[in-house]
Amino acid sequence: MLKNIIKQVWNQRRQNGWILLELIIAGFFLWTVIDPVYVLTVNHFTPKGYEEDGRYVLRFGAYGEKHGMRDTTVTKEQQRTAIDNMLRLVRDCPEVESALLVQNSSFPNGGSWNGTTYYADTLKSEERKYVNTQEYTFNNAGGGNLFKTYGMKNALTGGDIEVPQDAGGRNLIYVSENFARHMFGTTDAVGKKVYDYRDRAHEIAAVFKDYKHRDFEPIYPLIIRVNNKVGVGPYMHWTYMIAFNLKKGVDEDAFVERFEKEVAPNMAMANFFYDRLLSFDKQRTTWAKQSGTY
């Protein structure tokens, strides 16, 4: 019986070869065309996890060591004060609802990505459970709250997420639904602890709704850390940005025009200067075009 089957297959090898070639072509088409379209379509209809309207990040620059405008007498403390003053200038705008200092990898569709690994315990074994995750960091000085500024919500209650002023000192962290499910198998993770690569414990203060860092990519685990200190160094203007959201009903074009005319010039201090505003929606469009998914 087996010999007859083998003989039949061999006698029809040319026909079978064409069938195999057709299957290979069809599989290649499904892999290169249908699968990406399916992924992009599903991803398009997946909630972002944040609000875009009226959300901006402000980038500032710094004069280099050889620049003619650089003041060589500026101290680190003056630079730290300058960052606080620039943040205050944004917060004092009547159109602005809230503003805070974030690291440059901590806003949607940004050009940077900060990845790390968190563990379920401190046991050094092959069975040690871990999650590779993206990490956002923001400064909560003066009541800064990334969740309110970005419009992110509590996954369990659907409400706002409050951030205690001492959250950074207590090593509190905030995790996405995706992270909680990967680590614990449930989103009911408030009060549980996870450990960083140095085995430092971090208590989960809240679980927020899944969040897309880049609009054209699937959702990835995300944790958000709070820092109540501003590190001072030669690359501060690359490390930090000011994120803010406008009050409802504000004319965004009119705001940007007024801001760049009246507020931005006042940000020239301690070798820093205003660079530009990036709106969340335009930033998303820019990255979509660069990725070829627009």
Segments from the language model and where they lie:
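A short amphipathic helical element positioned immediately N-terminal to and/or at the very start
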Residues: 1-10, 86
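Short, strongly hydrophobic transmembrane alpha-helices
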Residues: 12-42, 50
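Short beta-strand segments
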Residues: 19-22, 57-60, 99-103, 174-175, ...
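Membrane-proximal extracellular/periplasmic loop immediately following the first transmembrane helix
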Residues: 34-124
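Generic structural signal for small/hydrophobic residues in well-ordered secondary structure
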Residues: 40, 90, 96-99, 147, ...
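Short acidic/polar micro-motifs at solvent-exposed secondary-structure junctions
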Residues: 63-74, 101-145, 152, 157-172
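Hydrophobic secondary-structure segments that place a key small or acidic residue at a functional site
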Residues: 131-222
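"Rare, low-scoring activations can occur
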Residues: 169-170, 177-178, 198-292
